[in-house]
């Protein structure tokens, strides 16, 4: 039986545009399929799955084949605890070169004073941020006040008192229902809430926007050590100049989590006061989402925090992932291009177009629209919870995620909303015409969902139904869009048997 690679090369023979990247990609799949069939099949099935759905989960995107290839090599075998040129292991010169180049590229891309590229995820970056702030602003001064050089010099009693002092300091951040992330400290199940006294600020009940005057009032009242700004489900931009002034007025550290909108900063969409880099003390982000890189984290900071962040090992990290850092470097270089800037602007244009068509059809959007890459539909008037809408849309080939809304009566599992994003569809090349078609499909599906009745004749809050004719029409329209805008068109699915 001919291998995948052989079939691919036969089909590609004589065709223009054949490149090494797609050949290498197929060679890797070919090897996995023959040597470890179950794993290889699952990888291929995932490729087929992603090519059969409109990916509209706001936190997901598509990375380039170059980014993916960078992670599949012997860099994964190298331990390199520490920072470039200051490792706890020998023979790290090649990893040093890659990490240094990655950090320098990040500084160039974002105009930052310092960059740290080791975090394995956005959650790791956020944990490192709070640990660096605690160490710099609370622990360090306390050790010095007691007349010691390091924390290891403290007695057990003094150390216990220091931990209690740290726990009394306030961290003020956006609540989960107002668009914050669980790592912003206001979810008690998360480790962040166990480090400091974490308090939330909310969006306005009237406008569903963050109220800077209210945030300033809370800051004056609670005098936080840390003010967190950022979001995972908020469809507007933030004014970081105002937030910096609010933080400075009480001496708080301004930490911005831009995991969702880093690509819009890199692409020059968010500028001046909407760009957090000139205002924040520490900025954290993921490298996937709107940046289109590998799954991972990244930190940017002022020089004040550079030394502490670079001591992530032993502060909270062990060995970094050099193969992922190599992929981050490639993604950051891709983000420096003119094409990426065009992409970033199109992401926002597409989100606005999508929002306009939803509103034209009478759907209610949180905040009344969007000016970033995402939007949140309030399903309350339709009488269906977010989990049901998510499942039904998935069944017709549209991937979205359920999402809480302010004062959500359905809770975090069912929710009263769904969140949609345009980064992935924009990566496929879709524009305003396609956004209109997508909106029309989604509206028709949502308006035809009914809740199933349980055995006791009550409506289910976990299962819904869609008329078969509506479902088939939606599937056909989704398939047409995907056929016109295929994922990785250079990878011929006909060879993946």
UniProtKB/Swiss-Prot annotation:
Pathway this chain belongs to: One-carbon metabolism; tetrahydrofolate interconversion; Amino-acid biosynthesis; glycine biosynthesis; glycine from L-serine: step 1/1
Keyword presence, Transferase: yes
GO molecular function: glycine hydroxymethyltransferase activity; pyridoxal phosphate binding
GO biological process, one term: glycine biosynthetic process from serine
CDD domains hit by this protein: SHMT
Site label Plays an important role in substrate specificity, positions: 288
Pfam families: SHMT
Record key words, sorted: Amino-acid biosynthesis, Cytoplasm, One-carbon metabolism, Pyridoxal phosphate, Transferase
Compartment annotation: Cytoplasm
Enzyme class: transferase
EC code(s) of this entry: 2.1.2.1
Binding site for (6S)-5,6,7,8-tetrahydrofolate: 176, 180-182
First-listed, main subcellular location of the protein, grouped into a coarse class: cytoplasm
Essential cofactor(s): pyridoxal 5'-phosphate
Reaction equation(s) it catalyzes: (6R)-5,10-methylene-5,6,7,8-tetrahydrofolate + glycine + H2O = (6S)-5,6,7,8-tetrahydrofolate + L-serine
Cellular-component GO terms for this entry: cytosol
Modified residues (N6-(pyridoxal phosphate)lysine): 289
PROSITE patterns, A to Z: SHMT
Alphabetized NCBIfam families for the sequence: PRK00011.1, PRK13580.1
Subunit and partners: Homodimer.
The family this protein is said to belong to: Belongs to the SHMT family.
Function: Catalyzes the reversible interconversion of serine and glycine with tetrahydrofolate (THF) serving as the one-carbon carrier. This reaction serves as the major source of one-carbon groups required for the biosynthesis of purines, thymidylate, methionine, and other important biomolecules. Also exhibits THF-independent aldolase activity toward beta-hydroxyamino acids, producing glycine and aldehydes, via a retro-aldol mechanism.
Designated name of the protein: Serine hydroxymethyltransferase
Species for this entry: Chlamydia felis (strain Fe/C-56) (Chlamydophila felis)
């Amino acid at each position: 039986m001919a291998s995948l690679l052989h079939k691919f090369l036969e089909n590609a023979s004589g065709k223009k545009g054949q490149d090494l990247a797609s050949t290498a990609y197929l060679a890797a799949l070919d090897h996995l399929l023959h040597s470890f069939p179950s794993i290889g099949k699952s990888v291929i099935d995932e490729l087929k799955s992603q090519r059969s759905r409109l990916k509209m989960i706001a936190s997901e995107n598509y990375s380039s084949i170059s980014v993916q290839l960078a992670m599949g090599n012997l860099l994964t075998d190298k331990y390199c605890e520490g920072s470039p040129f200051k490792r706890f292991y020998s023979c790290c010169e090649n990893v040093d070169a890659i990490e240094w180049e990655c950090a320098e590229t990040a500084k160039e891309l974002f105009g930052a004073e310092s960059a740290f590229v080791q975090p394995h995820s956005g959650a790791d970056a956020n944990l490192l941020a709070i640990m660096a702030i605690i160490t710099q602003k609370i622990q360090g001064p306390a050790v010095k006040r007691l007349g010691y050089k390091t924390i290891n010099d403290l007695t057990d009693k003094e150390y216990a008192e220091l931990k209690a002092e740290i726990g009394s300091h306030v961290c003020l951040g956006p609540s989960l229902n107002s668009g914050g992330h669980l790592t912003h400290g206001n979810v008690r199940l998360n480790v962040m809430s166990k480090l400091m006294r974490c308090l939330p600020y909310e969006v306005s009940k009237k406008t569903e926007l963050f109220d800077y005057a209210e945030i300033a009032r809370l800051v004056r009242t609670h005098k936080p050590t840390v003010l967190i700004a950022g979001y995972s489900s908020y469809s507007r931009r933030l004014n970081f100049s105002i937030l910096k002034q609010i933080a400075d007025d009480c001496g708080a550290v301004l930490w911005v989590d831009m995991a969702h909108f880093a690509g819009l900063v890199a692409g020059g969409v968010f500028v001046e006061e909407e760009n957090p880099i000139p205002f924040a003390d520490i900025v954290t982000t993921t490298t996937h989402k709107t940046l289109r890189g590998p799954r991972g984290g990244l930190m940017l900071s002022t020089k004040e925090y550079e030394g502490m962040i670079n001591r992530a090992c032993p502060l909270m990290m062990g060995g970094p992932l050099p193969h992922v850092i190599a992929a981050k470097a490639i993604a950051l270089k891709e983000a420096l291009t003119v094409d990426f800037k065009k992409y970033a602007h199109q992401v926002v244009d597409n989100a606005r177009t999508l929002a306009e068509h939803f509103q034209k059809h009478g759907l209610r959007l949180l905040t009344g629209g969007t000016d970033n890459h995402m939007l949140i539909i309030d399903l309350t008037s339709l009488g269906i919870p977010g989990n049901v809408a998510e499942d039904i849309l998935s069944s017709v080939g549209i991937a979205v995620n359920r999402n809480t809304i302010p004062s959500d009566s359905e809770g975090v599992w069912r929710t009263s909303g769904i969140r949609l994003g345009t980064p992935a569809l924009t990566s496929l090349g879709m524009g305003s015409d396609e956004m209109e078609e997508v909106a029309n499909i989604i509206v028709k599906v949502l308006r035809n969902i009914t809740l199933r009745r349980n055995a006791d004749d009550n409506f289910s809050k976990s299962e819904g139904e869609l008329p078969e004719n509506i479902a088939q029409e939606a599937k056909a329209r989704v398939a047409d869009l995907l056929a016109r805008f295929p994922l990785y068109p250079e990878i011929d699915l006909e060879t993946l048997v």
